[in-house]
Amino acid sequence: MQGTDEAPEFKCKCCGLCCRRDPYYAISLLDIQNISMGLGLRPEIFFSKYCEIVTTPGGFRYSAILAPDGCPFVKEGLCGIHFVKPIGCWVFPESSLLPVTDLKKHVNAIPTCGILGMADNDQALKADYELLAARDVQFEHTKKYYEQHDGFEEKTWREATDRLIEKLGDAEEISRRAEAIRAKASALIDRSKNRSVKW
């Protein structure tokens, strides 16, 4: 992972609680391709068996893996689709960009998470900013797809996914976005430091 040298690195304890706490897990158009290929299923079959289109509290429509009893791909506490897991899972918990001390307050609902055992720190976790940029591109395209389509349909999904893959191949765009995320992370850290100085 790329990040600042002094940034603490998260070490997952593989407790699996983060995979069992939400009723659904958002997935991108590319996630649908990767997971369905990993499972040996046609995308439409994967989608109809495991997914639904959900509307977020902000009013955005996304595809999501339904998880009323936890992610259906967790096996014995571990991810059964690790090598093709959703982009949102790849970037958790680094995607928060919060300083470790603040992040610990947000994950206290996951009492076995490795973050809670980390020393307080005013730095964000070491993060791969290019991967975070790719995540943003994937979900922007996914959001746009569901603004234009009422449901999942393999032909239009394939066309949209091909455009998404082309966009992800734009190294200059990913680099620009990664720098913007890095700047946002620095601003969050500075804001946190200023708050702690006032106390």
Each PLM stretch: what is its role?
Residues 1-199:
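Short loop/turn segments that flank or connect secondary-structure elements
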